Structure formats: C-alpha cells, structure tokens
Amino acid sequence: MLYEKFEYNINNLIGNFSLSKISIAVSGGSDSVALLYLANIWAEKNNIELFVISVDHNLREQSKQETHYIQNISNSLNRKHYSLSFDHQNNFSNLQERAREGRYDLMTNLCLELDILVLLTAHHEDDYVENFCLRLERNSGIFGLSSSNINWYNNIHIIRPLYNIPKSELVEYLVSHNIKWFEDESNSSDKYRRNVIRQKLAKGADYIRHFSKPVYREEFKGDTERSTAAYTSVREDASTGTASKLSLEAKCGKMSKAAIISQQLKTNKRIENEFKPELISAIAEAVKIFEYGFAFLDLVKFDKFSNEVKVQIINFLLIIISGQSRAARFYSVEPILKLITQDVNFKNTLHGCIIKRIQNELLIYREFGKKLPESKILLDKSVIWDNRFCITKNQEAPNCFVTHLSLKDYKIIKKQLDLEPLKNLSCKNHNAVLLTLPIIKILEKVIAIPHISYYDNDMWNFEVSFSPNFVSRFTHFC
C-alpha cells in the first residue's frame, strides 16, 4: 500500500520530466531511510540511476555513524553514495536555518556537478502540519502558510513525494521490513517550538496556537475587497478581507491535526488557483530584469495586483538582484509598499539592494554596503560570482580573478569605457550599476569588463550571464 501511494505521488510530481538519473537526500532518520528504499524500488522499475547524498553537519557524534550506515545501505542497493560536510565555523547563532541553507547548497551544487535535475527529500505529512503551525505563529501571509511539494533551489527541482504520508506509516514500513534507522536526540528537546508542536500532535492532542505577536498588522490603504486582513490569510472568505482577532483565535487558536491538514489544503488550493497565476502574470507584465543584474518594476501595472502578490513581487526582485537565498521580512517590505502608494520619488536600501523610484518605475540594483563580494579565482572554465553572475573564460588566462570595480580602477580606465548602452537602459544610473558588475583582473590590472565589452587586449574573451541562485516555491528564474 505504501509503495503504491509513493509511486503515484512521484510519478505525478515528476510529470513529463525525462530522467535517466535522480538524487535523494538521506540523513539516517526513519523518514529518509524509508524514502531511500521506496525510491530504490521505483528507480529499478523505471531504469533510473539513483544517487544517494548525505550531509554531516558536524554537530552530533552520532552523525558519523548515520552517514556510515547510509553508505552501507547504498552499497547493498548498488547505489552511489556521496557524503558531504557542512562547516558551521563554530558559529551557533541561527544554526538551524544556516545548517538548512548549507545543506541545500552542498546537495544542489553536487547535483549540478553530476548533471542531475531532481533531488528527492523526505518531507512527510507531519512536517507539513508542523510548518503550518509555526508559520501561523509567525503571522505568515497566505503565501507563507501555503506548502508546495515541488520547489526550486539553485536551479535544481526539489521534489517531496511523501507529502501526504504520515510518519507513522513510514515507521511501520521500516519495522515490518526489519530496517534500522537512527533517532536524532535533538528532536525530543523542548528547546525548539517545532518539537513541542510535534510531541502534542503525536499524542493526538490539539495544537494550541502560541500567540507571541499581535495577530494583525495595519492594512494597506485601498484594495479592500482583496486585502489580506494584514497577511494572516487563514480566513476562508477571501471576499470580505476582514476579521476580528477574536474570530481568528476561535478559528485557529485550537486545531486538531485533521483540521490543520484541511486548512492547509484549502490554502494550497487558493494559492494554486488564484494567487500563483496572478503572481506569474504580474512578473510577466510588470517586471523587466536585465543582464546587468538590475530590474525595473512598472508601478502602473503593479498597482492592479493584490497586496499578497505585491509583497511576493518585491521579494522576488530583492532575492534575484541581491543574490541572497532568503526573502526579506514583511515588516521590511511594508514601508516600501507604503512609499509606492504615496506617488513620490524615493531612494531606499533594503536586503542588499538600492530601491529607487523614477516616475512610474521602480529601479532595483545591487548594493554591496560594507560587505563586498568575495573575489573568485578563475581556475576552472567558469565561476559563480556574488551568487548572481556566471563568468566563463574561453581561453587560458593564468592568474586572473573575478571581483568588483573599485573607484580607483574606474578612474584609471574611465575614458576607455563605452557606457552609453548601460546609461540608456538604467535611466542614467549607469555609474552605480557599473560598480556592481563583475570584472576580471590580473594582479592589480583590469583586463576585462565583459558586460560592456571592455578588454585591454584582443586576446581576451570572457562570457558572462546573470544566473542568480534563486529559491522559490512559487516561480522559477532561469
């Protein structure tokens, strides 16, 4: 029964993908070990090569045993196993989030090296329930409360074929097949809110919402018919757009697991049928992204979309232009949206970007601030710089590296640069944008700025493309 459900899920999620190989993330816990055995059956049946990936976060002594165990299972199944290591650098602040990002960076980079398009992960039904509860407590909007069984990370398709399978079924499968797994001791700690929620739901108790913050924020002016009720978005009637704090607590303050799953499905359906199509339309109609790594937002077209989608659009652009993997918080985006409604020109910094209003357009370009992007040596044929640009060398260029243009370098080569095309495209913000572009240097000399076709010698030939490490559950950048 379990395999049939898994097979139906994975075939539906993969759809028309023509795959000869696929990767799977396995930690040693019951969820991922069960996924490994299920995926192995499916891969054999469909003649697909399966690559097993484990990441050691170097935080628990047991993790080495887990990795060794997964390697042994992989060998017994005749599957290639890759063991990766996350370096936490003895920095334990916000460790869970950094470890998650580091894990996905490592795994997806390996997938790119192996020319694999899909990575399977073991997120199951209980994980989705816990995520919904946590996001509800953070006052997430409807996009935040929704869940997805497919998303993108580093241009790799992340697929979750266990999304509607409870953990109990996975454990039962392992026990019935006499398969061993490891329990992470940190999962029983009350230190993390997720664990508290998990333990309550596991006992069949109702989830009781922890109200750590005010439930509602001030709504934006206008757009009342489809307002987000300040982005809590758990209401069932989208047309009213208003609800009292008391009614929301009554509705979501106490919920059974079944009620949470039901609410999650309703939220997902609304996203899929209403907001996701609107988001895609908004990007197509109102957004222009240029190879120089900046973007324009048409504010006249932007104005017609719902507030939920407006927040997503701003975050979409901030992530792409900054090269960061995480979205800005709502409270950071809210002032920008309010400024837009005031119909006056402004210039702000947010999330590693400059946001500048020019008449009826919003220009967004990179801002380094105090943290300059790391220089990259061009040892291989290509390199990713600032998480945004891919630079490729088409000839031998020893001792060259990619960095940004300093004011000192700019003054030296200024008269040799043709900035007219960039000037026209950026509404005369060419100098600011120029300083955010990748340049190639040998020692202290600038030998190339590929974006503006500057080369100090005809022998050089470099290609550059705007390829941000974009992460989204709702849309994809390529």
UniProtKB/Swiss-Prot annotation:
It comes from the Bacteria. One of its GO terms (molecular function) is tRNA(Ile)-lysidine synthase activity. InterPro entries: Rossmann-like_a/b/a_fold, RPE1, TilS/TtcA_N, tRNA_Ile_lys_synt, tRNA_Ile_lys_synt_N. Its main location: cytoplasm. It catalyses: cytidine(34) in tRNA(Ile2) + L-lysine + ATP = lysidine(34) in tRNA(Ile2) + AMP + diphosphate + H(+). One of its GO terms (cellular component) is cytoplasm. GO terms for biological process: tRNA modification. It is found in: Cytoplasm. Keywords: ATP-binding, Cytoplasm, Ligase, Nucleotide-binding, tRNA processing. SUPFAM superfamilies: Adenine nucleotide alpha hydrolases-like. Its EC number is 6.3.4.19. Belongs to the tRNA(Ile)-lysidine synthase family. Ligates lysine onto the cytidine present at position 34 of the AUA codon-specific tRNA(Ile) that contains the anticodon CAU, in an ATP-dependent manner. Cytidine is converted to lysidine, thus changing the amino acid specificity of the tRNA from methionine to isoleucine. The N-terminal region contains the highly conserved SGGXDS motif, predicted to be a P-loop motif involved in ATP binding. HAMAP family: tRNA_Ile_lys_synt. This is tRNA(Ile)-lysidine synthase.
